[in-house]
């Protein structure tokens, strides 16, 4: 077994900052650019109208689109927003990853252990020799030093290591892609090309937090011990995170199950109004919320609803309703980040992953007898407008809804549902299968669906 810390692993030019990404994105939309230079914009749809010559305004819009996509992707994949001051400087998570043999503490985290925690490796950031050694089994994945090499290569999806001139890790920050990207497993399980927007249902955020040597920053704001913090986050399990913990301090539900919720996808959001399971706000609101309050970046965030000592006592103590950092490392990035996210389409299922005839029958049921389309309105598969419902309307308890400002649950968009079956369905995974979801609604709305009709609905949902 070999480690690769002796030779570089980063592909030359793979990531040279926004200018490289801008060039790459420009290539991907070359058809648009070519059309602009020829004086015409290619018609996006068959409108039946003649396409007029492109104006200066048309060119400006198209060129800005290319720029926004490139900058947004760079932000989504690689920007820490200064969060290393929390994850590294405060929690000292980088020390636990490195281990005592590499200037840190404890045994360290090997690549195999990191993969078991649900972290992913971007194979596009690795030179061919490293990929070959991964596939042949000659790369040492049981050495924390190899983990550090992967961090130096910017190959760990959603995690950024900071190193001094002696190649010693000094801090660590996180990126949007940590929770909202995965990989295609093209090289090995957990190692492959990025799939932006896919919720990482393998990621055990709580277990990662729990290994940090110093949780006093969280313990102090929650007014509990560090051991209590570890007990709470270790209960989350893979694919879950509790964004409200540092707002209301509720680590567990009344039934003693974790209060954490499933990590949602960040694709298919174009045309969708409210975001998150309980509709905290639009995508733009949630990006600002998460980057400031959950990632612990340095920016500006204002939401007076959090200034409520009864509902959000922890948020009030921490002043989270009005955050203003100088310098602001987040706000200048939000517009392009939003643009990129809205461009991520929900992925279509592969042929053979659902039964087409059954799906066609299920589509008729979805729009007709089952009444699903009343709330999950095609083609958005959520309601245009204020897509929120009370717990009683959908037949579940109010615990998670009560942790949000509006006390309701969002109608989740359904496209790409096949990508995030792991961990169950609904906000907390209470329904283990799509069939269980349909059984719930069949009883709640007295639909009288037959067993065959339920099966057809499942196939239709898998086809979206």
Predicted region positions:
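Periplasmic c-type cytochrome electron-transfer domains
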Residues: 2-11, 19-21, 28-464
């Amino acid at each position: 077994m070999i480690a690769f810390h002796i030779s570089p692993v980063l592909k030359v030019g793979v990531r040279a900052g926004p200018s490289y990404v801008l060039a790459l994105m420009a290539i991907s939309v070359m058809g648009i650019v070519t059309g602009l230079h020829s004086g015409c914009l290619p018609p996006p749809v068959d409108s039946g109208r003649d396409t007029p010559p492109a104006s200066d305004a048309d060119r400006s819009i198209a060129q800005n689109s290319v720029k926004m996509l490139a900058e947004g992707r760079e932000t989504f994949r690689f920007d820490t927003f200064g969060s290393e001051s929390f994850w590294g400087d405060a929690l000292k998570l980088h020390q636990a990853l490195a281990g005592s043999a590499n200037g840190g503490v404890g045994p360290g985290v090997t690549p195999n252990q990191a993969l078991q925690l649900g972290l992913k490796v971007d194979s596009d950031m690795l030179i061919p020799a490293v990929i070959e050694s991964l596939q042949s089994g000659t790369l040492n994945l049981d050495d924390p030093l190899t983990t550090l090499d992967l961090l130096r290569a910017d190959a760990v999806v959603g995690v950024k290591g900071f190193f001094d001139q002696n190649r010693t890790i000094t801090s660590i920050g996180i990126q949007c892609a940590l929770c909202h990207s995965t990989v295609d497993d093209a090289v090995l399980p957990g190692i492959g090309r990025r799939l932006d927007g896919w919720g990482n249902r393998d990621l055990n955020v709580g277990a990662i937090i729990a290994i940090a040597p110093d949780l006093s920053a969280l313990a102090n704001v929650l007014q509990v011990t560090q051991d209590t913090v570890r007990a709470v986050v270790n209960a989350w399990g893979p694919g879950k995170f509790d964004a409200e913990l540092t707002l209301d301090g509720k680590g567990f539900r009344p039934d003693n199950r974790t209060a954490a919720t499933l990590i949602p996808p960040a694709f298919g959001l174009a045309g969708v109004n409210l975001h998150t399971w309980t509709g905290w706000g639009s995508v733009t609101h949630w990006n600002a919320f998460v980057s400031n309050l959950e990632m612990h970046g340095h920016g500006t965030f204002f939401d007076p609803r959090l200034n409520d000592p009864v509902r959000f006592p922890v948020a009030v103590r921490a002043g989270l309703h009005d955050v203003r950092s100088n310098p602001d490392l987040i706000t200048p990035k939000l517009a392009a980040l939003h643009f990129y996210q809205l461009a991520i389409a929900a992925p279509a299922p592969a042929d053979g992953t659902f039964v087409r005839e059954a799906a066609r029958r299920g589509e008729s049921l979805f729009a007709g007898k089952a009444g699903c389309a009343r709330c999950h309105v095609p083609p958005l598969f959520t309601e245009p407008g204020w897509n929120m419902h009370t717990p009683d309307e959908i037949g579940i308890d109010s615990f998670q809804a009560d942790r949000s400002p509006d006390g309701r649950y969002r109608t989740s968009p359904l496209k790409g549902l096949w990508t995030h079956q792991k961990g169950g369905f609904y906000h907390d995974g209470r329904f283990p299968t799509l069939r269980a979801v349909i059984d719930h609604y069949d009883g709640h709305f007295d639909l009288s669906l037959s067993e065959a009709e339920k099966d057809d609905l499942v196939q239709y949902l898998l086809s979206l």
